[in-house]
Amino acid sequence: MIQVESRLTVCDNSGAKEALCIRVLGGTKRRYASVGDVIVVSIKSVIPSSDVKKGAVSKALIVRTKKEIRRADGSYIRFDDNACVLLNNAGEIRGSRIFGPVARELRAANMKVVSLAPEVL
């Protein structure tokens, strides 16, 4: 459950390390985002000599949340951190690698994320 002012780990190799949610997309009164949702983020910390600059505004896809996700079979899954991958203006992933596991719910939202991830839970 991500809301405005939530800080997320960036888990791709775009060069950003941490991002701050500044908008949840999908309606005027929408407050929370979960796995598979797109948000607008501000980059808070970057690695040196990266293409992404600190303070840059970008869209991001949420791939992991601390808040558990209920599945159709009644089971729940949750992760240790809130993480996202950065997207470009066309909605494609900016990086070429993804670090850490991602949720199976992303299959419907974005197939490329699932194929790049080392583990799908």
Curated annotation (Swiss-Prot):
PROSITE patterns: RIBOSOMAL_L14. The keyword Cell membrane does not apply. This is Large ribosomal subunit protein uL14. It comes from the Bacteria. GO terms for molecular function: large ribosomal subunit rRNA binding; structural constituent of ribosome. GO terms for cellular component: cytosolic large ribosomal subunit. PANTHER family: 50S/60S RIBOSOMAL PROTEIN L14/L23 (PTHR11761), LARGE RIBOSOMAL SUBUNIT PROTEIN UL14M (PTHR11761:SF3). Part of the 50S ribosomal subunit. Forms a cluster with proteins L3 and L19. In the 70S ribosome, L14 and L19 interact and together make contacts with the 16S rRNA in bridges B5 and B8. GO terms for biological process: translation. The keyword Ribonucleoprotein applies. It holds the Pfam family Ribosomal_L14. Keywords: Ribonucleoprotein, Ribosomal protein, RNA-binding, rRNA-binding. The gene is rplN. Binds to 23S rRNA. Forms part of two intersubunit bridges in the 70S ribosome. InterPro entries: Ribosomal_uL14, Ribosomal_uL14_bac-type, Ribosomal_uL14_CS, Ribosomal_uL14_sf. SMART domains: Ribosomal_L14. Belongs to the universal ribosomal protein uL14 family. CDD domains: Ribosomal_uL14.
